[in-house]
């Protein structure tokens, strides 16, 4: 039997007898008939297996498939090469569930595919042990074929304070393999990538995008077989002996999210953004994302309630809507060497409790938030002195420190109950609207008792967050992991915001936030205006670039508002107010990135309303322009037959020749006065760009008349 999943843009075709194959994933087909799928049976070449070798949902060596199998495992050395035959298919309008079995190996494979109206395909495999003996699983993946014309790959690498930096490579015989073994989603290898036709861009080319929703170790590969067939394979990465299934037990892969675009990366991103907005993001749609002030870069561990209330007063005056006390409020947390795990209020710093501070914040009309890092412990803590056996470690080995801290074993029932009790106390005792949930180190030798435990640790974290969300449904949670070390769709099901990076350097943030935008919409991307001197790079940047960079996310600020100059306060207030004016558009529209000619020196992106009657775009000059003039900027996403009025909302102080003349003697004509041009002109001819200094930006808005 042949089956089809379809929406207005995408078709996914299956052949299920005797083995299930996903035969096509791409542009919607016109005048489709199910029997057409049979035309996809290929030629059988000489000097190979004498029959067609199907490429199934879980590729099997036993069928003559010499690529990486979808399942590797055994039952005491037996049943190591299963072959799954289709037994049952259940189809609805937007989903298909396929049950396949190997009666010899006594294994069942259940494959789930759901095609959302956004154009995102959700895929998952589940393995069930039907035999009497335990089945040891070494690897278990979800596999998607891609066409031969997918010649190029774009993925993301990075490190702390440098997340989501893109890189491209040609897909050749050796393929591409990405592994993350750091115990969290990681800064180094985001579990998502795109493959596409050679030279695919933001607005052109065919693109297939995938993301593995998993917050632990992962492996993703793009492979090319000797017959030219290509595939993507994604999975949670297991330690040796980590996963075994007793009779009747099941194991599921993480959900894989995939989509197709025939209009470049922008359309791919819009599919992912629409999917998240409709299915995963959990804050009230009618509630604006409040502007944050986090105290960390203002006071670090030096907590004084009277001074913090002064900070809150100043914060409210510049337009802050959510005030967050960061690290240092609990235990004897005077530095990062001590106190983690002691989730009791530090009465030395807060002799009257947190209530006076919270009341002051609320009276100013702001929400109140607080920082926690529940998964961690310092050895210099009351908790460790009482329970040294609560660490996540392998007995007999010396666990290395990371940022002076260690991990708690969440699978230990006593640890889980302690954390649940302390967090319940915190959220029940105080009027808290938001918690920043941090996780500040990588995981080495993660042993639960003597067994490897990353999968269990990750799933138990999910369970803890699920319970807290059920008990406190109005409390929002931010996922932070030394910045962007835990950003993925599965953790987003339990949180409402990501701390994108510990870097507030606006030049680096331009690249980091652009990279994140391929998979996540602006409203979940924490983007703060930092101080003039960035604490991670020691670069000093103008407020213009800092403010406009933070504008395109869930805005916040990092400062001590009591100490900054009046000029800086005015700058923060200006960009906060500008963000609030544009927030309804920024957090509901279609995010677009523009292809610019001088893409090493400049980048441009924006948000277009769903109508699309209005849009806002930033042009950010990162380095010195390659040429004296930067050419024309062609916009995207507009209505060709509509007239748009163009307005410059923000630009550097030194750009106007009448005032300064530092970079230009004449502005481009469209910047001299109110200009109206057609969408067709703006998208095909474009606007001549002004000359900009490095580390500056302009913001323009276009609106239909």
What feature does the model see in each segment?
Residues 623-705:
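C-terminal beta-sandwich/jelly-roll accessory domains of carbohydrate-active enzymes
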Residues 9, 125, 248, 293, ...:
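Conserved, mostly hydrophobic/aromatic
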Residues 84, 243-262, 695-702:
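Short Pro-Gly-centered flexible turn/kink motifs
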Residues 284-421, 434:
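Aromatic-lined carbohydrate-binding/catalytic grooves of carbohydrate-active enzymes
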Residues 50-55, 60-81, 204-217, 259-283, ...:
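Glycine-rich, aromatic-flanked loop segments that form ligand/cofactor-binding clefts
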Residues 9, 194, 202, 597-639:
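Carbohydrate-binding surface patches
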Residues 351-353, 385-387, 391-542, 554, ...:
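Active-site neighborhood of glycoside hydrolase catalytic domains
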Residues 1-14, 20-223, 239, 643-664:
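Polysaccharide-binding surfaces and accessory modules of carbohydrate-active proteins
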